[in-house]
C-alpha cells in the first residue's frame, strides 16, 4: 500500500469521526439520579433541562440538595464522556 493511499484513508477516517462527534454533540440524553433528579443534557455537555422532585426541596437542608445536584450532573457528564469515547475508539483501526 502506498503512502498517498494511506493518507487518503486516514483523512477519510478522520472526517467520518469528526462527523460522528458533531452528530453526537447535538444528541440529547436524559439521566435520572436516584429517581429524584432528571437531567436532559446534550452530547456537548450543555444542560438543557433539570427537574428536581419537589420532595427534595427542604429549605432547612439546602446543602443536601446542592450535593445531590452536583452528583447528578457529574454522573451525567461521566456517562456522556464514556459514550463519546466509544465513538472515538470505535473509529480507530487499531
Swiss-Prot record:
Task of the protein: Binds to DNA and alters its conformation. May be involved in regulation of gene expression, nucleoid organization and DNA protection.
Domain of life (superkingdom): Bacteria
The keyword Cell division is annotated on this UniProt entry: no
Location (main, coarse): cytoplasm
Gene3D superfamilies: Nucleoid-associated protein YbaB-like domain (3.30.1310.10)
Record's subunit section: Homodimer.
Family per record: Belongs to the YbaB/EbfC family.
Database matches in HAMAP family: DNA_YbaB_EbfC
Organism for this UniProt entry: Malacoplasma penetrans (strain HF-2)
Protein name: Nucleoid-associated protein MYPE8070
A GO term from the CC aspect: cytoplasm
Amino acid at each position: 500500500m502506498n503512502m498517498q493511499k494511506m493518507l487518503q484513508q486516514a483523512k477519510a477516517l478522520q472526517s467520518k469521526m469528526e462527523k460522528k462527534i458533531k452528530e453526537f454533540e447535538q444528541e440529547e440524553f436524559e439521566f435520572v439520579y436516584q429517581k429524584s433528579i432528571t437531567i436532559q443534557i446534550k452530547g456537548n455537555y450543555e444542560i438543557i433541562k433539570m427537574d428536581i422532585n419537589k420532595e427534595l426541596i427542604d429549605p432547612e437542608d439546602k446543602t443536601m440538595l446542592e450535593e445531590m445536584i452536583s452528583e447528578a450532573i457529574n454522573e451525567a457528564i461521566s456517562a456522556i464522556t464514556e459514550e463519546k469515547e466509544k465513538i472515538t475508539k470505535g473509529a480507530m483501526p487499531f
